């Protein structure tokens, strides 16, 4: 008798699972098919990139995937995060830019398969940490250079209908390597090692702060936003 009921129980189990996870399944499907209607393909449009890089003391709410999340609400908390910053060698500020003291190139590898960032000096890895790359839109592959950096940045986008809407003030340690795509700190989740973003590369706050200071262009003291130049070039970024 029981074996006759097994097919029915299996069908009921599947139906219950689908009903409980309908929103998530539907969301994944429409994004995979490219019919979500969500135009967001990076963390920022070019015109939304901060010109000052200053911390926004007036921000009161942060939203990720349609839900409010907590975040460092004052520049004092932001300053604490910056105090964690050290170069991979543990020394402060003497191996900055696109080469180290030995003249070796400093470059950043972003592995989408491994969901990891590796900071290299020549052929030596000096830092490695998990990241979250694009889930709802792909992270672009190729060889780039950091063209702009901001210490703090508001990011918004996604779809309220599909539950991917985000409004994230005071995102830290932003390194824009291709148009509005950036490697940056993420305070709104701790799921590093899994794709989570609309194309940008999320990193743990402490690692993002370290690599931000390690990479070029170098921001002088008191400067919170800077474009790379011939005299202050951006670090090479290889995404694969």
Placement of each model-derived feature along the sequence:
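Exported/periplasmic cell-wall-interacting domains
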Residues: 2-53, 139, 150, 157-240
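Gly/Pro-biased beta-strand-loop elements
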Residues: 79-191
């Amino acid at each position: 008798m029981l074996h006759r009921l097994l097919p029915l129980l299996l069908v009921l189990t599947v139906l219950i699972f689908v009903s409980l996870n309908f929103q998530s399944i539907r969301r994944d499907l429409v994004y995979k098919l490219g019919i979500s209607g969500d135009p967001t393909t990076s963390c920022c449009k070019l015109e939304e990139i901060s010109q000052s890089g200053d911390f926004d003391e007036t921000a009161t709410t942060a939203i990720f995937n349609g839900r409010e999340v907590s975040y460092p609400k004052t520049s004092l908390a932001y300053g604490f995060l910056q105090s964690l910053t050290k170069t991979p060698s543990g020394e402060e500020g003497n191996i900055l830019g696109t080469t180290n003291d030995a003249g070796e190139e400093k470059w950043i590898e972003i592995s989408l398969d491994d969901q990891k960032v590796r900071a290299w000096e020549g052929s030596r890895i000096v830092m490695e940490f998990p990241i979250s790359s694009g889930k709802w839109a792909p992270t672009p592959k190729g060889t780039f250079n950091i063209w702009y950096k901001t210490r703090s940045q508001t990011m918004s986008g996604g779809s309220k209908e599909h539950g991917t809407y985000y409004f994230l003030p005071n995102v830290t340690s932003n390194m824009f390597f291709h148009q509005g795509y950036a490697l940056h700190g993420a305070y709104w989740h701790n799921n590093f090692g899994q794709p989570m973003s609309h194309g940008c590369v999320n990193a743990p706050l402490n690692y993002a702060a370290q690599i931000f200071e390690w990479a070029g262009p170098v921001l002088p003291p008191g400067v919170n936003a800077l474009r790379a130049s011939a005299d202050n070039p951006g670090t090479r970024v290889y995404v694969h």
